[in-house]
Swiss-Prot record:
The name this protein goes by in its record: Copper resistance protein CRF1
Keyword Nucleus carried by entry: yes
Keywords: Copper, DNA-binding, Metal-binding, Nucleus, Transcription, Transcription regulation, Zinc
Its job: Transcriptional regulator involved in resistance to high copper concentration.
Location relative to the cell: Nucleus
Binding annotation for Zn(2+): 11, 14, 23, 25
Native source species: Yarrowia lipolytica (strain CLIB 122 / E 150)
SMART domains listed in its UniProt record: Copper-fist (SM01090), Cu_FIST (SM00412)
Gene, per the UniProt record: CRF1
Main location class: nucleus
Listed GO biological process terms: intracellular copper ion homeostasis; intracellular iron ion homeostasis; positive regulation of transcription by RNA polymerase II
Length: 411
């Protein structure tokens, strides 16, 4: 309910529902609330004459003989015209407007006064802020700034510095910034060597660490793409006397000891990784790039390090995408891994041990001596270090990329 100049207004729905006291619908058209009791007559002359609030039903003053005929607004042709039927005959000084004695107001009429007050308050605040800014004194300049600056003496020297070329790209500028590490690492330190080339021949060591630590499932699949530059750099490091790769012990994060040879990381092991993974293999070319020689004891075998059979067949060296057959027997027969019954002519993969690695051979956890018969040879006809249970059925991928198993799967 809205009160304007002592007159109450409410919406039509609240008036019909007798809820005028709780009406807050200011966004809808508002209608004047009539006072309690019978409404006053719409005829001003009759209302003033009778001095009551009775409903004007019929006017008897409209006769021509009446003394009020000239001044009665409802007189027209000898009859009474009620304001409910003809609202246009209302006098201009009437207190009510409209056919039913009600007025209709909008929200704009109600907000007009509040908007004017808000504008006046805003103007006053702006004027006060302007006066305060004018009254505030301007800050004086400090005496230090007012003092004349003394010219700095220029010392001429005969030494000329070469111009520094500014980098054109942002990534070059980032690469030229000095390192924040307090102790720089030497290029031959084990930490830098492990960061540059890891045991699998890849240049990004963080990717191998994340791939080994991220998945807890042991049947992990990883795509191995060794680059030629990283392999050549690793082979040069392995052949040098001061190489940190002599007698490398597998770190703690390596799950299987077959991923790293027990001897030195020499060119023979790198040649295995550098094999062309995209060309298809024939039946007799499976181990063409490897050093195929029978199990023998060399004279350079110091510290119990065997030269032949020192490295078991890692599952990362077999590309299952090269074979189209899905039978394990056909794969074993085509690989020719199991040899004859006696096992004397069975080929064996070996990595040539570096003679200079014998100095640190005492710190290497070596397998049993080659003079004794290994446990996997006793009572079996397969002299190879890979058993038929270690061979997984080959599978194909839609992307036709080389897929390797980082750990052997057992059937």
């Amino acid at each position: 309910m809205v009160v304007i100049e002592g007159i109450k207004y409410a919406c039509e729905r609240c008036i019909r529902g007798h809820r005028v006291s709780s009406c807050t619908h200011t966004q809808q058209p508002l209608i004047r609330i009539k006072p309690k009791g019978r409404p006053a007559t719409q005829c001003l002359h009759c209302r003033e004459a009778r001095k009551n609030k009775a409903l004007h039903v019929k006017c008897k003053c409209g006769s021509s003989s009446s003394k009020h005929a000239a001044t009665c607004p409802c007189y027209s042709g000898g009859g009474c015209i009620c304001t409910n039927k003809h609202p246009q005959v209302l006098p201009p000084n009437s207190t009510t407007t409209g056919a039913n004695g009600c007025i209709v107001i909008n929200k704009a009429v109600l907000d007009e006064g509040s908007q004017q007050q808000a504008q006046q308050a805003q103007q006053q605040s702006q004027s006060q802020q302007a006066q305060q800014q004018q009254q505030q004194p301007q800050p004086q300049a400090s005496p230090i700034l007012q003092q004349p600056q003394m010219p700095t003496p220029v010392h001429t020297t005969n030494v000329t510095t070469p111009p520094v070329a500014t980098p054109t790209h942002s990534h070059r500028a980032l690469s030229t910034t000095p390192s924040l590490s307090p102790q720089p690492q030497s290029p031959h330190s084990p930490e830098s060597a492990l960061k540059s080339v890891n045991f699998l021949g890849r240049t990004n060591s963080s990717s191998s660490l994340s791939s080994l630590h991220s998945g807890r499932n042991k049947n992990r699949i990883e795509k191995v793409r060794p680059s030629h530059n990283s392999l050549s750099a690793a082979s040069q490091l392995a052949n040098s006397p001061s190489s940190p790769f002599y007698a490398v012990t597998p770190p703690a994060w390596v799950d299987s000891p077959t991923l790293v040879p027990t001897g030195a990381l020499d060119a023979s092991y790198l040649q295995i990784l550098n094999d062309d993974l995209s060309s298809p293999l024939l039946d007799s070319d499976v181990f063409s790039s490897l050093d195929m020689e029978p199990v023998a004891h060399s004279n350079n075998n110091h510290g119990g390090i065997p030269t032949g059979g020192s490295r078991a067949l890692a599952s990362t060296d077999i590309n299952f995408d090269r074979f189209e057959s899905t039978s394990p027997s056909s794969i074993l027969s085509s690989w020719n891994l199991w040899g004859g019954v006696g096992g004397s002519d069975a080929p064996e993969m070996s990595v040539a041990a570096n003679p200079s690695a014998s100095a640190s051979a005492s710190s290497i956890q070596t397998p049993p001596s080659s003079n004794a018969t290994p446990e996997w040879v006793q009572g079996q006809q397969q002299p190879c270090s890979v058993s038929p249970a270690d061979v997984m059925l080959p599978f194909k991928r839609d992307d036709q990329e080389s897929v390797f198993l980082t750990e052997p799967l057992y059937l």
